[in-house]
Design a protein with these regions (language model features):
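Alpha-helical membrane segments of multi-pass proteins
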Residues: 1-185
């Protein structure tokens, strides 16, 4: 239960107004730090929810596929430039961000990941790498300002962050093909 407490502390910390204002003031930090930290907070709280609602997880997410689909939908939604803008200007959308990333992305991701077959995990790696590559191209190549609240230079910085993430995920996927994980369990 210590892990759930750490997740709750992280969650509350990320919602503090000064922390939120600082994280959302720079586009790359908003997308590549604040949002993943909300997902991590949800992942840390997952064991608490699994103990409190065991039937929900065993019935709803028995093979991990529904949870990983929900995770992917939420992640794709928050990658759209329009949603980042709306999170800064519409309080209801920001509240949705505070709820959806930890509880609709982080919790299902942790619950699903150990249930997924290796083949499905590989599909997720390839999909995320391709999506991040596309988002990198979108943010770097676009001559127009995609987010009204951020400068074009911040948009390009975010795009290069997506290039880095796409490359890292792809390299990790390639190394999983050559390393037998059962040797390290």
């Amino acid at each position: 239960m210590k892990q759930a407490a750490y997740g709750l502390v992280l969650y509350i910390f990320l919602m503090l107004p000064p922390v939120t204002a600082l994280a959302e003031s720079i586009m790359a930090i908003h997308m590549h730090m604040q949002m993943p930290l909300f997902v991590i907070a949800g992942m840390l709280m997952t064991p608490f929810f699994q103990k409190k609602f065991p039937n929900l997880f065993s019935k709803w997410n028995s093979n991990g596929i529904p949870g990983i689909i929900l995770f992917m939908i939420i992640v794709l939604y928050w990658m759209l430039p329009r949603t980042m803008d709306e999170a800064l200007t519409i309080p209801a959308v920001e509240i949705f961000k505070f709820v959806s990333l930890p509880f609709l992305a982080g919790v299902p991701l942790r619950d699903s990941w150990k249930k997924l077959e290796t083949r499905v995990k590989n599909i997720i790696y390839i999909s995320l790498s391709a999506i991040f590559g596309f988002m990198a191209w979108l943010y770097i190549a676009s001559p127009n300002q995609l987010c009204n609240n951020y400068l074009i230079v911040e948009q390009k910085t975010l795009g290069w962050g997506f290039v880095f993430l796409a490359a890292c995920i792809f390299i990790y996927f390639i190394q999983t093909l050559f390393i037998d994980e059962t040797e390290y369990e």
